[in-house]
């Protein structure tokens, strides 16, 4: 017998804060929380517990729909099964991540990494974000949200994506095969891509060399988009102005890693979206 569509399991319970937020959202939306053996849908409530999915779904007899908590689904790829309808958090976290990009850009252009580490009064440095030339890799919700935030700065924005369909708010949209031509013309390269076999290592030594030596690299996508050793070399040699990274490869970045030692590298610990920011957004969605 098929279960009623409003019977939803919220599992696992390993992250109580996320479990509570998602369970409350189900109930506010008119759903009923039930054990997975009785459910027609599963709200998966711990993005770090993908390995528990097979044992969990084995208890289900009527589940037709699985909702994943984050936009990134790479840890679940091996578990995807066409017999279920899958949805994820794509687009839900775009506003806070776009806000991180704005923060990172202003920090980079105003040379905050240098000033934050200074032990004595440093020389004046910095430049204006107003009118800057920016390349954004990826044309999804994060990029759209960022473009709305950056609009008052009157920047020249080039979105690089697989498809040529124009992204609203961008000065222009080009396809990935034009990336090499774009890199040498911009003041900052912003990575906001999903990680796939095609995008892994998209920024390597050759493409870092193609960037201007006064350009910044920002990564809010996944650490695997950048070849880390190549980035370390580029930063050491001042081939680019610097990097601001919210994601790294490996992640967490180990103590003593060369990236921690570089004055032109600013690292944040994957806080483009935090639980405090994201849980209300996904619960509302």
Q: Which residue ranges define each predicted feature?
A:
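C-terminal helix-to-coil terminal segments
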Residues: 17-18, 87-97, 114-118, 251-285
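Glycine-rich NAD(P)-binding loop of Rossmann-like domains
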Residues: 112-145
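Redox-cofactor binding/interface segments in oxidoreductases and associated redox assembly factors
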Residues: 42-45, 68, 190-191, 219, ...
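NAD(P)-binding Rossmann-fold cofactor-contacting core
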Residues: 152-169
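Phosphate/diphosphate ligand-binding glycine-rich loop within oxidoreductases
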Residues: 41-118
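N-terminal glycine-/charge-rich "phosphate-binding" loop or analogous flexible N-terminal tail
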Residues: 1-48
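Rossmann-like adenosine-cofactor binding region
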Residues: 164-258
